């Protein structure tokens, strides 16, 4: 991508996501915008802005729209924690979303097929972007010891804390991870014609131990994810998209 300046916005659902993002990405210039805390960093041809959105779909969608209206970013990042829906995805692995599925929308039908309106794709849906991510994933594994997987995310404002629902989401949507907010951020970006990414780190296995695992693993997992995100944004990888 050739651009005099690339504007990147990062939507942080919770306090921990925002604080780790600010610290590890070395963001400063913290201020308040319409009741939201934001911070930023400019380096070479990259300008990154992070916003503390608040947890849940409404908070993250409204924060995404606020940032789009005020700053006109080229890219929006959905970031945060996720539960694993398959034994192939482990704690501290990073999942980069290809397609997100809103699974708990009442369409009056069984959870079998999601209408197109409830499916949103990221830039990793395109072959050229997949190749960039493949190169970056290999580099991250070799230099940082971090595992990055690309796949679908099931998104709904419902805790996935049992193997029945977990298996259903995996089988019917081919999803490898789940969380509350991804679809709301990606859909808001799509409706505004903004390219989107989703980097989500695994904190639990979407089973009966979900709450305990999420609480005990979250901070360490974020410490794994944000250095990777920092490299992707500021070390030239995003310029290749």
State where each predicted segment sits.
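N-terminal short beta-loop-beta anion/metal-coordinating cradle
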Residues: 2-65, 71
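Alpha-helix C-terminal capping segments
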Residues: 66-70, 88-89, 186-195
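Proline-aspartate-enriched helix->loop->beta-strand connector
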Residues: 72-77, 175
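Mid-sequence, gly/pro-rich, charge-dense loop/helix-turn segments that line enzyme active sites
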Residues: 84-173
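Generic non-transmembrane alpha-helical segments
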Residues: 131-146, 188, 224-235
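A C-terminal functional module that forms or caps the active site or interfaces directly
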Residues: 158-211
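His/Asp/Glu-rich mid-to-C-terminal helical/loop segments that flank catalytic regions of hydrolases
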Residues: 206-241
């Amino acid at each position: 991508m050739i651009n005099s300046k690339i504007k990147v916005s990062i939507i942080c659902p919770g306090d921990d996501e925002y604080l780790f993002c600010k610290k590890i990405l070395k963001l400063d210039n913290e201020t308040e915008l319409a009741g939201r805390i934001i911070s930023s960093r400019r380096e070479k041809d990259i300008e990154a802005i992070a916003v503390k959105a608040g947890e849940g779909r409404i908070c993250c969608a409204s924060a995404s729209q606020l940032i789009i209206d005020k700053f006109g970013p080229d890219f929006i990042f959905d970031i945060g924690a996720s539960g694993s829906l398959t034994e192939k995805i482990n704690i501290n692995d990073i999942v980069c979303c290809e397609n997100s599925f809103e699974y708990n929308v009442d369409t009056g039908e069984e959870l079998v097929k999601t209408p197109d309106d409830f499916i949103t794709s990221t830039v990793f849906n395109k072959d050229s972007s997949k190749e960039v991510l493949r190169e970056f994933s290999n580099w991250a594994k070799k230099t940082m010891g971090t595992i990055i997987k690309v796949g679908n995310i099931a998104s709904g404002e419902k805790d996935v804390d049992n193997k029945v629902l977990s298996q259903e989401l995996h089988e019917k949507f081919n999803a490898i991870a789940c969380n509350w907010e991804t679809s709301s951020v990606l859909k808001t970006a799509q409706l505004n014609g903004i390219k989107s990414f989703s980097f989500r780190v695994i904190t639990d296995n979407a089973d009966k131990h979900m709450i305990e695992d999420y609480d005990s693993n979250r901070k360490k997992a974020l410490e794994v994810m944000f250095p990777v995100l920092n490299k992707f944004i500021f070390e030239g990888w995003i310029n290749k998209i």
